[in-house]
Structure formats: structure tokens, C-alpha cells
């Protein structure tokens, strides 16, 4: 199960310490469904990890137990965080979707439950991998929770129920739009790692997000 046997505390590892990851960790630490403790953090960028740690430590001092040796930076940091939380713990996976299949697969392999944000992968191959991992999780009795917030909205569920009952008649076409400020991308300056530069600008590169 998700609960650690010795003290019933749910151990959390945060992988991806940006705004969404920090928010998801805060949600988990403020949950009323069980005692929770953040024990490991991982990110490619040290500044993101530091900012997230300071914010969470300030808000949940008694529940954030992440000493320097359990704050991991780099592309392999996710492995160290998953190992630190251990079997039965929970990984909060909130990186950009390029890394989701790799990280979630490793967590399930190590016996760690997963909460992952959307989107689940940037391409069909990654999506198929996530579906394969889901089957593996079922076989191991591990849980994968997904951040599809609209599916948890009772108002939206009621609206969809009405549509399915025919309240709008026969639907022949649906168009959905999202209004956004748009993406501005400056030229690559050439004085740093281009991969890291692209990761800082995820919405400009399809492979990242």
C-alpha cells in the first residue's frame, strides 16, 4: 500500500520542482486523507529545486524532511529521488511530458506509486509506453493518479451527462479554443547547453511538452 507500515506516513518524492510540481506537492502535504511527508526532491535545474524547497519548507515545515543529501539535481536525479522514497512511497511527477514515460516506468519498476501531471507524453510512442506502464502497475497493485482536473469536476460531469442524454440534440461538430498570450522565442544565444535552453522554453518545442 501507499502507507509506510512503521508510522503510517505517506512518503513523497517530488520530481519536477517548477510551479506545477510545487503546487501538487503542496496539495499532497495539505491532504486530509492521511499524514504525508516530503522526503526527496529532484529537478534538472538547481534554482528550481531551491525555490520549491524554500517555499514548501516555509509552508509545511513539519512535513518537509528533505536534507541536502536528498535534493537531487541533473538528468538522473529522478532515479535517486525514487530510490530515496522507496517501495510503497509516492512519486509526484511534474516535469515536462518528455520525461514522463521514463520516470513513471522507473517508479513502477521500483514499487513506487505515482501521481503524474498531464499531458502524459509528447508523442504517440510515449503515450503507448504510458499505457504499457499502466498495465504493469495493475499487475503490481500500484496506483497511478493523473492530474486530469476537469474529470474531477462534478459540474462538468453533470454537463457531460446532459449532453449524452441528448439535451443539445445530435452533436455533429465540436470546436474547442484556448485563448493564450502566445509564445515568444528569442534566438539561441549559443553560450550554453541547447538542451537546457530548450527545457527552459518548453512550449516552444514539441519534444519537450
Where are these regions (language model features)?
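Conserved PLP phosphate-binding loop immediately N-terminal to the Schiff-base lysine helix
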Residues: 123-125, 154
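Predominantly a Rossmann-like dinucleotide-binding segment in NAD(P)-dependent oxidoreductases
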Residues: 16-21, 140-145, 150-209
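Short helix/strand-capping hinge loops at secondary-structure junctions
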Residues: 111-113, 117-119
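Hydrophobic residues within beta-strands of alpha/beta enzymes
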Residues: 91, 114, 171-174
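A cross-family glycoside hydrolase active-site/sugar-binding cleft signature
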Residues: 94, 117, 145-147
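N-terminal glycine-/serine-/threonine-rich beta1-alpha1-beta2 phosphate-ribose binding loop
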Residues: 1-112, 125, 129-141
Amino acid at each position: 500500500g501507499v502507507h509506510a507500515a512503521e508510522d503510517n506516513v505517506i512518503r513523497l518524492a517530488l520530481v519536477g520542482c517548477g510551479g506545477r510540481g510545487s503546487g501538487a506537492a503542496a496539495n499532497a502535504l495539505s491532504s486530509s486523507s492521511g499524514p504525508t511527508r516530503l522526503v526527496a526532491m529532484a529537478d534538472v535545474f538547481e534554482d528550481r529545486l531551491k525555490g520549491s524547497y524554500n517555499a514548501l519548507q516555509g509552508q509545511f515545515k513539519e512535513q518537509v524532511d528533505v536534507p541536502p543529501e536528498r535534493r537531487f539535481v541533473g538528468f538522473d536525479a529522478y532515479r535517486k529521488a525514487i530510490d530515496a522514497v522507496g517501495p510503497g512511497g509516492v512519486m509526484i511527477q511534474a516535469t515536462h511530458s518528455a520525461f514522463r514515460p521514463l520516470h513513471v516506468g522507473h517508479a513502477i519498476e521500483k514499487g513506487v506509486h505515482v501521481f503524474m501531471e498531464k499531458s502524459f507524453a509528447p508523442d504517440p510512442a510515449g503515450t503507448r509506453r504510458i499505457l504499457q506502464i499502466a498495465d504493469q502497475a495493475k499487475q503490481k497493485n500500484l496506483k497511478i493518479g493523473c492530474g486530469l482536473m476537469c474529470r474531477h469536476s462534478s459540474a462538468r460531469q453533470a454537463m457531460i451527462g446532459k449532453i449524452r442524454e441528448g439535451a443539445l440534440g445530435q452533436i455533429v461538430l465540436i470546436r474547442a479554443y484556448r485563448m493564450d498570450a502566445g509564445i515568444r522565442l528569442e534566438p539561441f544565444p549559443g553560450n550554453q547547453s541547447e538542451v537546457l535552453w530548450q527545457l527552459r522554453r518548453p512550449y516552444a518545442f514539441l519534444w519537450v511538452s
